[in-house]
Amino acid sequence: MSSRTALAPGNDRNSDTHGTLGSGRSSDKGPSWSSRSLGARCRNSIASCPEEQPHVGNYRLLRTIGKGNFAKVKLARHILTGREVAIKIIDKTQLNPSSLQKLFREVRIMKGLNHPNIVKLFEVIETEKTLYLVMEYASAGEVFDYLVSHGRMKEKEARAKFRQIVSAVHYCHQKNIVHRDLKAENLLLDAEANIKIADFGFSNEFTLGSKLDTFCGSPPYAAPELFQGKKYDGPEVDIWSLGVILYTLVSGSLPFDGHNLKELRERVLRGKYRVPFYMSTDCESILRRFLVLNPAKRCTLEQIMKDKWINIGYEGEELKPYTEPEEDFGDTKRIEVMVGMGYTREEIKEALTNQKYNEVTATYLLLGRKTEEGGDRGAPGLALARVRAPSDTTNGTSSSKGSSHNKGQRASSSTYHRQRRHSDFCGPSPAPLHPKRSPTSTGDTELKEERMPGRKASCSAVGSGSRGLPPSSPMVSSAHNPNKAEIPERRKDSTSTPNNLPPSMMTRRNTYVCTERPGSERPSLLPNGKENSSGTSRVPPASPSSHSLAPPSGERSRLARGSTIRSTFHGGQVRDRRAGSGSGGGVQNGPPASPTLAHEAAPLPSGRPRPTTNLFTKLTSKLTRRVTDEPERIGGPEVTSCHLPWDKTETAPRLLRFPWSVKLTSSRPPEALMAALRQATAAARCRCRQPQPFLLACLHGGAGGPEPLSHFEVEVCQLPRPGLRGVLFRRVAGTALAFRTLVTRISNDLEL
């Protein structure tokens, strides 16, 4: 789940009004808990007791996996089914009306998407002050993190991933939705290494013949027409970004980069990039179809699906548009299980028929999800019928046994798979023992688990962990895309690059808001994001005195993980949070009505834009700002999932079914490995806790010291081969460079 701190997309069209959260809202419901296991608890609020973990609705919160300025992402487990989910928790009280509007639009768009390579939204829970989005958990992390750790992909592996990306993006375009922030940080991997596109915070609906004018996205992935300030139809900017992504997958670096925004802009507008010697002719050919300066001559995704390179190894299985299957809401086995949980057939039918994003629909959908360990749908002991799905051979989506497409996908999966690290997983009990939902009491209970990070403390994001959700931007108004939580936290790394790191190593792109545009050289922007027709249509060139955004290193610029020119930014208006007025001068009288209460909302008041300086001068000055305060402290139970009590019966490490991501193996007893790990981490000056018998949660640096803060976990796992154990390292927060340095140091000390 990307979720990144980013500028919220502007309202490109009049249709950008408040979305409808609809049936997902349940603020009028009060405490509800699993009567079998947890006693009475509030279904739609967070609560905690001395011996239990906090809960939200039917979900037990396990740990924080991402943080943004006004949002958090929690890894949680659905009590009734045992499935893991990611819950995005957004503090609505911190958001201005424009930000709320964009948040509701994102939710509305996610409700309409049902593709195996797009993160699925299961449930929406809304209270007066908080919005909870229950989404699919992509446990294997970001494609970005893989590229940082392993470098470029082989073309066969990149092809398997890229087919899924193209299928998902084409599906969005078929539904008249443009993503506008496609990049490696927003591509997640599930337990089977299938792509999951996340972070629709900048997405918008488009109409043929109607132009969009909002400049948003990460500069290295942004199309040239965006740098020129031209209006665009929509899909063509995603197609350019797909070309950059393909180049990145195959080469491990970016086709367009620069020491500052001015240099990057010039390179993008030239459209010239280096072709690595190892890139095949067919791959080079398809790249040239994506990276075309003239958007009118850029290829379409329908043409790409017929390209030779994308279908190599898939003879007879040409990539075709995804056909969304008819929803199977009549699975009697799942319905019977839900009846055993305490739901009535009537409410099940109503929720599924009306497609309400409430607890009933979420339970039904989660019962049909695969378990990561078993790979089968449904709960253990239940022969749940599979939901009908289209064949992978035609749609190039998630892997399915038996097809040649799956052969390539399995090969890719073996390379990229990262297992989740929780040893406390226990699937749902057989049908007769399924926990029952408890009755709902009235009353709207507010959050008690923990406060959302404040504006100052929220400048850094902590957390994607596996959800490779990218970190929050350290500066400007990420409230404008509140539904973004960052993983992991990034601070600019002042340390030198380790010698064992490749010079072209990937660096993360932050997310920012371009808050103002020049009034004299750029079309005036109304607070609703519409352009004033009295202006011109181009962004002026960058100021010659552009601020340097990152120090160069080698032939290509080498930026820290939080590098600014790789940040997503957006040319919308930003409300002055202190004055409570829009940047255009329109007074905001309060947040918009919740879309769960009103399906139509009046447009935000408009006003005259105030005069500003050059766009790129303003942007670069903001992008060069750095947060000097210490990031929000990671301490206590928030350090890891590990404040969970040990399972007293657990005497062996977790069995790692897919061991391809394990780099260190040993035949030592697991207890001896843990002892060696404790010594090695102590020698590396890490502060460690042991939340589970075979898991260490470690912190290094930070607290005002010279070294950046790094938060990671080390787990000893049992491999399928008898008598062989593996050591898994997982970065939770901090820069990739610092993490890799620590892993190398600890691994050398282990002498495995």
Curated annotation (Swiss-Prot):
Its main location: cytoplasm. Disulfide bonds: none annotated. GO terms for molecular function: ATP binding; cytoskeletal anchor activity; gamma-tubulin binding; microtubule binding; protein serine kinase activity; protein serine/threonine kinase activity; tau-protein kinase activity. Residues 1-36, 385-615 are annotated as: Disordered. Ubiquitinated with 'Lys-29'- and 'Lys-33'-linked polyubiquitins which appear to impede LKB1-mediated phosphorylation. Deubiquitinated by USP9X. Keywords: ATP-binding, Cell cycle, Cell division, Cell projection, Cilium biogenesis/degradation, Cytoplasm, Cytoskeleton, Kinase, Mitosis, Nucleotide-binding, Phosphoprotein, Serine/threonine-protein kinase, Transferase, Ubl conjugation. The active site is at 181 (proton acceptor). This is MAP/microtubule affinity-regulating kinase 4. It comes from Mus musculus (Mouse). The lineage of its organism: Eukaryota, Metazoa, Chordata, Craniata, Vertebrata.
